[in-house]
């Protein structure tokens, strides 16, 4: 790994939010109360992006998922497609659709993988652009949410070192 600075992480070490991931086990530990967020996203898709085939198709899928959830509200409502829809709307529907699909489809697996190397992003909360609680953040020993960058970069650096990955600094 080539780092332009004398330490690992670059701008990532400054990240304070968390990592967005859809349909994770950590989300299921929360009580769902974001009905208004889902409705707002579906309305935005219909009102502002009716001429965009990708957004319209996602909105149709999410509408069916949302109706099924409302008929049988078990667990926390989220889906890969809702995350895709939020991402497309956040990008004003000019996103690379295939890249959005890849990002969203692999997001829960990424959270699971991070857990295997000791990067536990167990706190799930709301953040701008997401219709539901989807941002995964680390917590300290007291259960207080902490900055993701200063937490995750050392964990990732150690995982790389444990696997013999060479770092080149400066």
Please identify what each model-predicted range represents:
Residues 1-54, 121-125, 137-170:
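Residues forming the flavin
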Residues 20-103:
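Glycine-rich active-site loop/strand segments that organize a redox cofactor
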Residues 79-87, 91-170:
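Conserved redox-cofactor binding core of oxidoreductases
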């Amino acid at each position: 790994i080539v780092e332009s600075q004398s330490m690992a992480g670059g701008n990532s070490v400054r990240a304070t939010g968390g990592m967005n991931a859809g349909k994770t086990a950590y989300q299921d530990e929360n009580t769902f109360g974001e009905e208004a967020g889902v409705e707002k996203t579906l309305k935005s898709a219909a009102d502002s992006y009716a001429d965009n085939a990708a957004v319209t198709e996602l909105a149709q899928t999410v509408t069916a998922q949302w109706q099924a959830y409302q008929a049988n509200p078990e667990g926390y409502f989220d889906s890969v497609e809702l995350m895709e829809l939020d991402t497309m709307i956040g990008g004003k529907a000019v996103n690379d659709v295939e890249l959005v699909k890849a990002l969203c489809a692999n997001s829960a697996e990424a959270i699971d993988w991070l857990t295997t190397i000791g990067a536990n992003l167990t706190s799930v909360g709301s953040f701008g652009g997401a219709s539901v609680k989807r941002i995964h953040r680390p917590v300290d020993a007291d259960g207080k949410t902490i900055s993701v960058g200063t937490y995750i970069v050392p964990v990732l650096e150690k995982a790389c070192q444990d696997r013999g990955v060479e770092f080149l600094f400066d």
